[in-house]
Amino acid sequence: MKRVLGTLFLLAAGLAFFGCTKKDENKAVKDIIAQAEKMSFQELLEKAYAESNGKEVSGIGNSSRGKTAGEKFVEEIKKVHPDYTGSIKWSQPKNNSIFEALTKDTESANPVQAVTLIQDAAQIKNKMISTGILYNFIPKEWRETAGVNIAADGNPLALQTLSKVFMYNIVDGSKKYMNVWDFVKEGEKPMFMGLDSEPVGKNFLYMLTEKKYVKYVKDAYQALSAEDKMYFDPIIREIKPKVKELNLTDDAEYSLAWIKLFVTQFNKMTDDGPISTEIVKKSAAGQTALIVYSKLRSINESEETSVNNIAVAAYQDGYEGFGGYAYKHYLQIPKNTPYPWTACAFISYMVTNKDGFQPWGKDMGGYSSNPSINQDHSRDGYVDGVDKFPAKDDRGYSWWVSPDFGRLVIEETDYCAGVQFSVGLWIDSLKK
């Protein structure tokens, strides 16, 4: 009873906090964004030059690569105006503190943050957008590019979609994981970052309760053997009442059962880096992981470690269920940005210019929201014309998000924010 009352209190508190009205809008910044959305990148570049020449423009983000993008942006201005002496100062807060940092900066007497690259859809919506701390900007040339999905990536504006995929060690060949339910069988302990260390992992679990992804989970269950179904059936039946309690779609008990097993069984790790170096070892035979796909790029080949010691689950013929999940990096403008024109130009540069996206696009597993500036990584495993590391041959965004192939579970801002204080609290009750 105490747990129920506590949950209800937290739910009410959360709704009260995040349901409050927006803070006073900054009309001047809003007006500049409205003008900027009608301008070309070159026009924005002129505005940025006039606004920030000789100034230090601060940016803050979840990705350290924003620093490289900022340096490239400055060089882009100098191509047109060699006398430009402005700079981009980039910072990367640790331990999920970016929300607090942006809030404090916005409320300070002299805000300094001009632009942000931020992740975690649920918190962005509930803490930053609904409260009016961050403003959205959609560049004209991005909006007009063929293949851009404005509905999925425009509000908030996504820089990129990043994939985290299931993989397993194949050194002794003792196990094959051909169904996403295989990763939550009795005794399985996939290596995964703790949910408090990287909350985008919780967004993945939230999205599993959305109708589209519920079908992925149920379809994978139906492909199981009769013996495997006998193991999972009691768990699914026991959890079914939660579907109504959490106001979820039909058949969500399949997703809730999978989530419960995953959350209570996974091997909690501090970061994807250590997971990636562990899963590729000969000594890690039979181990599994759910990690950022791009980590495979930095594996040092040796007698003990090799990319060829693992298999990407979704790449196996006949694999059933989702192959992993995808989260996004979003580009936003703080409401009290001191350099709104420069922020708009910088954002436009990152989503419309191949050089602007290059700090992220140079690696597999990250896909720009603008398909025209993505790089091809389908032969990243080739050495001297020979495909020596097939697991590194990225099949691309379209393959990974297809319901017929990779079936990534993709975070959606509104859905994640909407279930954070229902499904999210239930997940918290499961955590070890």
Show which residues each predicted segment covers.
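Extracytoplasmic/periplasmic substrate-binding proteins
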Residues: E253-L256, T264-N336, V383
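Conserved C-terminal helix/tail region of periplasmic/extracytoplasmic solute-binding proteins
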Residues: K30, E37, D393-K432
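Extracytoplasmic ligand-binding site segments that recognize negatively charged/polar headgroups
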Residues: E56-E75, I88-T103, P111-P274
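Bacterial signal peptide processing site
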Residues: T21-K23
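Mature extracytoplasmic/periplasmic domains
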Residues: G324-L408
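Immediate post-signal peptide segment of exported/extracytoplasmic ligand-binding proteins
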Residues: E25-K27, I33-V57, K78
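C-terminal motif of bacterial Sec signal peptides marking the signal peptidase cleavage site
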Residues: A16-G19
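Positively charged n-region of N-terminal signal peptides that target proteins for export
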Residues: M1-V4
